[in-house]
């Protein structure tokens, strides 16, 4: 079981697997086939929406339909934001509050985070996979 950051999920949704690292690409394929489980922090969905509105990302369908697809997919689960995730996020000192909350969710669940960025990888507080 794994937790995804925003960019890997968007690359997967945009059908751009070449932008994912080899291990991340395999994990998303396995989840798509129901052989693995990737948790999507609720805050990731909010960040995706904000980035769509800003024009940074495009999705292959309407946002609500895209989110609903994760409810129906056996290899994905949306993880709600709760106080435990927020509490865990306090150990991270990244400039981006989304990064802190996503990393806090991974720490709370005790799962590796699918992410490329070196700032979280260098923290040694959670395992990252790319």
Predicted regions and their residues:
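Acidic, PIN/NYN-like endoribonuclease modules and their adjacent C-terminal/linker elements
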Residues: 1, 103-130
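Conserved beta-strand segments of alpha/beta enzyme cores
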Residues: 37, 75-77, 126-127
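Residue-level signal for well-ordered alpha-helical positions
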Residues: 15-16, 51, 92, 126
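Alpha-helix capping/helix-boundary segments
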Residues: 8, 44-45, 85, 102, ...
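Histidine- and aromatic-rich ligand-binding microenvironments
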Residues: 2-7, 41, 95-99, 117-118
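Active-site neighborhoods of divalent-metal-dependent phosphate/nucleic-acid chemistry enzymes
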Residues: 58-60, 64, 72-116
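Short, well-structured N-terminal submotif of metal-dependent ribonuclease cores
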Residues: 1-40, 54-69, 109, 123
């Amino acid at each position: 079981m794994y937790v995804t950051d925003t960019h890997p999920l968007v690359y997967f949704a945009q059908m751009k697997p070449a932008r994912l690292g080899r291990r991340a690409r395999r994990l998303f394929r396995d989840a798509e086939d129901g052989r693995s489980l990737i948790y999507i922090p609720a805050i990731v969905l909010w960040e995706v929406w904000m980035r769509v509105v800003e024009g940074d990302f495009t999705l292959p369908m309407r946002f609500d339909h895209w989110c609903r697809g994760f409810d129906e997919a056996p290899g994905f689960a949306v993880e709600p934001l709760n106080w435990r995730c927020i509490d865990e996020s306090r150990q991270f000192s990244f400039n981006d509050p989304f990064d802190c909350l996503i990393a806090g969710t991974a720490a709370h669940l005790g799962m590796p985070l699918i992410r490329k960025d070196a700032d979280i990888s260098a923290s040694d507080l959670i395992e990252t996979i790319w």
